[in-house]
């Protein structure tokens, strides 16, 4: 899309909607996507949910729906959220992890986003005008107050920052 004038042809359309930045970024614009479930016989109709989810949950959720047992080594990080997808409850995933283009990790809970420190530059250099979200210091955002990730609260909420850093470390360590 970059050589075919897609950027120019989009005009004022923002592909990442209300979120900051876009694809390749550590910000929400790089990972937040709508998830649409359409199944007239099985899913609640006309409902929307802001429950946190992850595409990594597809194997466990679809296996449950299909009554297929996954082996312990299969889809290790996948969680069954089929009842949330079908609108039968609103239970969100506890957290989701994303990786930006330079391999820096983010940990997203229902209301907060932690972006791990990174030595990458502030903008993508090879293509679109996209903020990377990379900084040499940890970042923490309250997404319930600003989906655009405007105010870094890492210094104001050190205990929450440490808790999310520890959780990301545990997940990376396989715990």
Please identify what each model-predicted range represents.
Residues 3-28, 43-47, 51, 56-139, ...:
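C-terminal cap/loop subdomain of S1 sulfatases and analogous C-terminal strand-loop tails that border
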Residues 32-33:
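Catalytic cores of eukaryotic secretory-pathway lumenal/extracellular enzymes that build
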Residues 36-38:
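Short beta-strand-to-turn element immediately C-terminal to the catalytic PLP-Schiff-base lysine
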Residues 61, 149-152:
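A general alpha-helix detector
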Residues 146:
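Intrinsically disordered, low-complexity polar regions and short flexible loop motifs
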Residues 151-159:
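Active-site-proximal N-terminal segment of extracellular/periplasmic enzymes that hydrolyze or transfer
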Residues 161-168:
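Short amphipathic alpha-helical coiled-coil/interface segments
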Residues 168-175:
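Bilobed periplasmic-binding protein-like "clamshell/Venus-flytrap" ligand-binding domains
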């Amino acid at each position: 899309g970059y050589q075919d004038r897609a950027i120019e042809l989009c005009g004022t359309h923002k592909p990442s909607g209300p979120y900051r930045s876009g694809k390749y970024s550590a910000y929400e614009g790089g990972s937040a996507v709508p998830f649409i479930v359409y199944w007239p016989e099985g899913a609640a109709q006309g409902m929307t949910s802001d429950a946190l989810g992850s595409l990594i949950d597809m194997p466990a959720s679809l296996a449950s729906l299909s009554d297929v047992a996954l082996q312990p080594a299969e889809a290790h990080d996948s969680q069954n959220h089929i009842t949330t997808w079908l609108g039968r409850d609103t239970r969100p995933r506890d957290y989701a992890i994303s990786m930006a283009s330079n391999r820096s990790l983010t940990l997203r809970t229902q209301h907060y986003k932690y972006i791990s420190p990174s030595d990458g530059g502030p903008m993508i250099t090879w293509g679109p005008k996209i903020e990377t979200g990379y900084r040499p210091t940890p970042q923490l955002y309250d997404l319930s107050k600003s989906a655009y990730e405007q105010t870094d609260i890492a210094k104001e909420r050190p205990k929450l920052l440490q808790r999310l850093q520890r959780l990301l470390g545990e997940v990376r360590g396989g715990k």
